[in-house]
Amino acid sequence: MKYTFLAVLSAVTVLATPAPVPTPPNIPSASTAQSLLSGLTVRPQGPQDGYSRDKFPHWITISGTCNTRETVLRRDGTNVQVDGSCAATSGSWFSPYDGATWTAASDVDIDHVVPLSNAWKSGAASWTTSQRQSFANDLSNPQLIAVTDNVNQAKGDQGPESWKPPLQSYWCTYSRMWIKVKSVYDLSVTSAEKSALTSMLNTC
């Protein structure tokens, strides 16, 4: 099958044909996600006071010389080659948020699906540093995913009530990931956040 190139922006190529979508682990079905959402505590966000990314130690060593970022790059990429320090030297990465494919690891961010700041304001402020480190480096749940860097930066610490992936076709998966993480870590949701997640689940 021939690929039709729609655009070339710097190192990115957007493909007309579907690319394999990376699948972080432990994404629930839509029906399970709906049940999990119903079980989440609904309350206003807590204060930002005291928050710092440093309170969520991230990109820790996972295996050998590979840290969390490098591990996710290898998991979510295709034909990824690394050097002796585990830095990706070649490969390609499809970003399911916007449908772009990148060939330089420097153009890819590892997104915390539930942002650290959001977690802080919905329960993580009371956690120990060890608990926050586990959250920030969680490879067992759908909390980390490789995506286009500027899309991740546009998301910032926003919840689904104010930011959704540009590709509407990914809203179903994104909402299921978000809900799973909130459920695993017993984090609260706001009423607007719950409403947005419900609407996104309705696209499944």
Curated annotation (Swiss-Prot):
Subcellular location: Secreted
This protein's GO CC annotations: extracellular region
Name of the protein in question: Uncharacterized secreted protein ARB_06907
Keywords, in A-Z order: Secreted, Signal
InterPro entries assigned: GmrSD_C
Domain of life of the native organism: Eukaryota
Secretion signal, residue range per the UniProt entry: 1-16
